[in-house]
């Protein structure tokens, strides 16, 4: 699917339409939650919802600007989703954030007696479904929540949504790469990293 077929034009994009499409960032789901209706570009004939990558591009910029207000060590990146683990960890390591990949231990944000207890100021999750526990705890602690959301996700308790395919390996690599690059730019740092640096070989 080319940009001409979708008819999308981006204003000062982080990457080209073609690069977003090649990574599959626009590929949504066949199930829709009304919370995500504003992020739908169109519905394909087979019932697949296409994500509006114009809004993806805008939201990545917005989230990076928001995160740049925080000390990196106060940002907590969490993902249980397999394909999100490598790029999320890369993002956290690059900017100096806290991270947790794999199964989230209940109480990590709420029980100071746990060995892995952390006290961040803001939380980023890869999927509100798989990462529901950390969202619940962040809300209990009054922390803002940023989430990568697909068309089937509910966004209650999410403060900032990045609309994206949050199931595909390449899509997650692209979004975390762009978030890293834009965050560093907000901090006045020019990065030579490429999206390939965020792609796991597995």
UniProtKB/Swiss-Prot annotation:
> What Gene3D superfamilies does this protein's entry cite?
Glucose-6-phosphate isomerase like protein, domain 1
GO molecular function terms here? Answer: structural constituent of ribosome
Q: Which domain of life is it from?
A: Archaea
Q: Does the keyword Ribonucleoprotein apply?
A: yes
> Which InterPro entries does UniProt cross-reference here?
Ribosomal_uS2, Ribosomal_uS2_arc, Ribosomal_uS2_CS, Ribosomal_uS2_euk/arc, Ribosomal_uS2_flav_dom_sf
Enumerate the UniProt keywords alphabetically. Answer: Ribonucleoprotein, Ribosomal protein
Cellular component (GO) terms are: small ribosomal subunit
- What processes does the entry annotate via GO biological process terms? translation
Family, similarity comment: Belongs to the universal ribosomal protein uS2 family.
NCBIfam families membership: uS2_euk_arch
PANTHER family this protein is in? Answer: 40S RIBOSOMAL PROTEIN SA
User: Protein name, please?
Assistant: Small ribosomal subunit protein uS2
UniProt source species: Methanocorpusculum labreanum (strain ATCC 43576 / DSM 4855 / Z)
The protein's gene is named rps2
């Amino acid at each position: 699917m080319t940009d001409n077929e979708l008819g999308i034009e981006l204003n000062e994009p982080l990457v080209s339409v073609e690069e977003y499409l090649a990574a599959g960032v626009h590929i949504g789901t066949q199930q829709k939650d009304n919370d995500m209706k504003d992020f739908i570009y169109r519905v394909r004939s087979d019932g697949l919802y296409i994500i509006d990558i114009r809004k993806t591009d805008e939201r990545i910029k917005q989230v990076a600007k928001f995160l740049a207000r925080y000390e990196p060590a106060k940002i907590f990146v969490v993902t249980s989703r397999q394909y999100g683990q490598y790029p999320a960890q890369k993002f956290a390591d690059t900017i100096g954030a806290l991270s947790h990949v794999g199964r989230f231990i209940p109480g990590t944000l709420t029980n100071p007696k746990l060995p892995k207890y952390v006290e961040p100021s803001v939380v980023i999750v890869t999927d509100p479904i798989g990462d529901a526990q950390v969202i619940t705890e962040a809300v209990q602690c009054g922390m803002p929540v940023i989430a990568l959301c697909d068309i089937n996700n509910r966004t209650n308790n999410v403060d900032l949504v990045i609309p994206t395919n949050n199931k595909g390996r390449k899509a997650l690599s692209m979004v975390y790469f762009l978030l890293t690059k834009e965050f560093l730019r907000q901090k006045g740092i020019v990065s030579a990293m490429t999206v390939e640096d965020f792609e796991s070989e597995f």
